Amino acid sequence: MNTNVFRLLLLGSLFSLSACVQQSEVRQMKHSVSTLNQEMTQLNQETVKITQQNRLNAKSSSGVYLLPGAKTPARLESQIGTLRMSLVNITPDADGTTLTLRIQGESNDPLPAFSGTVEYGQIQGTIDNFQEINVQNQLINAPASVLAPSDVDIPLQLKGISVDQLGFVRVHDIQPVMQ
């Protein structure tokens, strides 16, 4: 009889352990699905922003639009050559938003010293019928690069606009500067 009781206890323990293992696997699966849903939502939002950025740039006759949520560069044909531009390190601060404008030359030559204009603000309406509101601008200057291909990071302080309000950054009038 002792062996039957022992077998019964062992069998009960195995059922309990198997139930725990299954619950653990179910919890892990739920966590994986939740993480995947969050990643898909973020990917969908980035895709929408990339599409919007591409449409704005297709319609733009002057400069290049960069949308904070796009997280992808855009090309600008300028007086100093073809440039790839992107926004990185976008963070809130007490006066608005700080970010870095990354400019990369696409040729094998170093970039000359240059200046340009950065406009930023909000976009109201649809991409097909939009209006830029609360637009502010600032001039940028970059020294000549020594190395090629050239990357220039320009820190920007966008005063008076929070990260959530920032709808666009537009860079235009890139011109060489004589030193």
Regions found by a protein language model. Name each.
Residues 1-20:
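Sec-dependent bacterial lipoprotein signal peptides
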Residues 2-5, 32-51, 155-179:
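Contiguous hydrophobic segments
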Residues 5, 70, 115:
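Solvent-exposed, flexible loop/coil residues
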Residues 16, 22, 162-165:
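Short, solvent-exposed coil/turn linker segments
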Residues 20-88, 92-98:
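Membrane engagement elements in two modes
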Residues 73-179:
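Membrane-proximal structural modules of membrane-associated proteins and complexes
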